[in-house]
Amino acid sequence: MIIKKILPVFIGLLIVFGCNTPNNETTIVEEDYGNPPAEGFNLAASDKKAIEIADEVMKALGGRKNWDLTQHIHWNFFGSRQHTWNKYTGDVRIETPSQELIMLFNINDRTGRVMKAGREITDADTLQQMMNSAYSAWVNDSYWLLMPFKLKDSGVTLKYVGEDTTQLGEDSELLTLTFDGVGVTPQNKYQVWVSDETNLVNQWAYFPNATDSIPRFVMPWADWTKHGDIMLSGNRGERQITDIMIFDELPASVYTDFAPVDFSSLGAK
């Protein structure tokens, strides 16, 4: 269970996010920049139409170039955990107020520091357990916010199902995502509806196992809003992702110091 007291685990995938600083010295037009798949994306088994739709989604989100240039992302996951992620370095800050818990770690090497109830955890075994927990929480919570950017991720096979309508009656194209050998629960399956009108994701369904025919849940992706140079959605129907902010720069101490941070004063885009 990743989301204790809130939800069962809905995603355990290892999401391969780019952590390299883009080359800002080269001017690249969006058409030439493209939307290349992550290494390990199952191109051979994926449908051409599904890939074309995924590329249209990326354009609607602001374009691959703007996504790659986005560095710091901050959000509150369903009122439970607050995340701040440096996409270039892999550094993450997770705060869980209900547990008086702050975790500072790096998703690439899964090392870091943890403070619980005002005291830093120094026991090696306990710290490693906390790092594993932090990583799982980040994988889960970031996918709930950033899934549409990850349609061509490593390990993903993308299939086109056909035309469909959402529960709210929106005309859409339906995709299926399955996974191979990545993450915590690679047996999961998702169906993703893409709006004919906006090319943005407007609904998803989660299946604990790829062989399941009935989803565990179906939820909307609504209220798309521009943050910085990209589009993000926090409305999942009964659940809300809030306090979404994009930063070009943040003090290094955000990722290294347990001291409280007032993100509203740090100049979100």
Residue spans of the language-model regions?
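Acidic/histidine-rich, surface-exposed loop or edge segments in extracytoplasmic proteins
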Residues: 31-41
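Short, basic/low-complexity N-terminal boundary segments at the transition from targeting/disordered tails
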Residues: 50-59, 67, 71, 138-144, ...
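N-terminal mature ectodomain segment of secretory-pathway/periplasmic proteins
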Residues: 39, 45, 51-122, 161
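Bacterial signal peptide processing site
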Residues: 20-22
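C-terminal motif of bacterial Sec signal peptides marking the signal peptidase cleavage site
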Residues: 15-18
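Gly/Pro-enriched, hydrophobic low-complexity segments
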Residues: 169-261
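Flexible, processing/modification-adjacent segments and terminal tails
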Residues: 114-186, 211-212, 254, 262-269
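Sec-dependent signal peptide recognition
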Residues: 3-9
